[in-house]
Regions:
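The beta1-alpha1 cofactor-binding region of Rossmann-like NAD(H)/NADP(H)-dependent oxidoreductases
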Residues: 53-63, 95
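Residue(s) in the substrate-gating loop at a strand-loop-helix junction
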Residues: 133
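Substrate-binding pocket helix/loop in short-chain dehydrogenase/reductase
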Residues: 89-90, 97-99
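C-terminal beta-strand-loop-alpha-helix "lid" module of Rossmann-like NAD(P)-dependent dehydrogenases
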Residues: 166-215
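Conserved glycine-rich cofactor-binding loop
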Residues: 12-13
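Active-site helix of classical SDR
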Residues: 113, 149-152
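A glycine-rich helix->loop->beta "capping" turn
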Residues: 67-78, 86
Length: 274
């Protein structure tokens, strides 16, 4: 396998960290990017370069891409992994928090694509792997703004795949299901805090408890499950448009497609009664 120069964001923990290690183990030159560079220092022992990058800061992203191009002369793969989930009722999530959700999950991802595309186009080759979610194919109770962000990633990736193909650039999406990371705990805390003292507090508190219990259990897939899909998307000669992976990913998408909307809505509300 030819060595690729890879930039991966959100690499300080969870899926990003696991994927950075696996890509390096496969012989690729990996640039791991995140805000907390201190958490990524152990990656250096595996031959991974560490970059400070804030995906809400355009200059930070531009500086990071420029540093890689200066050192390597090319970027073969961008893995857009940075993201988080802010849960809460549409009415109670502040516009500031909603904008931040989109800044991190959508606009940061889009800006990094814009920054690497000129170099990839000049190379006549390249690959962009966007970490989406089954949350871009279904909607959960109180997940409104997070789902807006992931549905946007799906649409942007589909559009970019068509636009970039004539230049030899492939675009793939990873759609994880329930993965055992801190994501669910953080989302549950956001939900509880955003609903405090509002008309939604009772259901939101119960749903937050359901989320927390789910993500503290041992029934979820590990980050390595997603990493395997990322490796396939990076190394395949002809990558698929979508790689669905992780526990319940196929089941969630199937039932969201199959069930009438009122049945799905009732199923989601039932989760707040458990």
């Amino acid at each position: 396998m030819e060595q690729k120069i890879i930039l991966i964001t959100g690499a300080s923990s969870g899926i990003g960290r696991d994927a950075a290690l696996a890509l390096a183990a496969h012989g690729h030159k990996v640039y791991a990017a995140a805000r907390r560079t201190d958490l990524m220092e152990p990656l250096r022992a595996h031959g991974i370069e560490v970059l400070h990058m804030d995906v809400t800061d355009g200059q930070s992203m531009a500086d990071g891409v420029e540093a890689i191009l200066k050192a390597e002369g090319r970027i073969d793969v961008l893995v857009n992994n940075a993201g988080y989930g802010y849960f809460g009722a549409v009415e109670t999530v502040s516009m500031e928090e909603a904008r931040r959700q989109l800044e991190v999950n959508v606009f940061g991802l889009a800006r990094l694509c814009q920054l690497v595309l000129p170099a990839m186009r000049q190379q006549r080759s390249g690959r962009i792997v966007n970490i989406s979610s089954v949350a871009g194919r279904s909607v959960f109770y109180f997940g409104g703004w997070y789902h807006v962000s992931k549905y946007s990633v799906e649409a942007l990736s589909d559009a970019l795949r068509m636009e970039a193909k004539p230049f030899g650039i492939d675009v793939a999406m990873i759609e994880p299901g329930a993965i055992k990371t801190d994501w669910g705990i953080i989302a549950a805390d956001h939900l509880r805090d955003s609903a405090a003292g509002t008309a939604y507090e009772t259901d939101a508190t119960r749903w937050a408890a359901t989320l927390r219990s789910m993500y503290q259990s041992n029934h979820l897939s590990s980050p390595s499950t997603v990493t395997r899909a990322i490796l396939r998307a990076v190394e395949s000669r002809r990558p698929r448009a979508r790689y669905r992976t992780g526990r319940l990913s196929g089941t969630i998408v199937f039932f969201h497609w199959l069930l009438p909307a009122r049945w799905w809505d009732a199923l989601m509300r039932l989760g707040a009664r458990v």
